[in-house]
Design a protein with these regions (language model features):
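Core segments of cupin and vicinal oxygen chelate
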Residues: 11-61
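Generic detector of leucine side chains in alpha-helical contexts
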Residues: 5, 28, 49, 67, ...
Length: 88
């Protein structure tokens, strides 16, 4: 059995909006962020991405990927909106 969760990651629409919300509204500490260089293949395929992390305590983080060059994400029409959530 594992001892702790290092991080979970989700996609976000806008990295800057996400930083503002999680630091100013939720009160989490911004831990790290990186933007892939043009032409980078960090996950085996060329992708434009911004990856940001927030501290949740006890060595755990919540992370987000902003994929600015990808089509906008869509909600799954077969999943009720209350299913997808984060609880602190």
């Amino acid at each position: 059995m594992f001892q702790k969760l290092h991080h979970v990651a989700y996609r976000c629409r806008d990295a800057q909006e996400t930083v503002e919300f999680y630091t100013k509204v939720v009160g989490l500490k911004y831990a790290a962020g990186e933007q892939s260089p043009e032409g980078a293949r960090p996950y085996g395929e060329e992708v434009d991405l911004i990856h940001i992390f927030f501290e949740c305590g006890h060595g755990s983080y919540i992370a987000f990927f902003d994929l600015p060059s990808s089509p906008p994400m869509q909600a799954d029409p077969n999943t009720p909106s209350w299913v997808n959530h984060i609880a602190f």
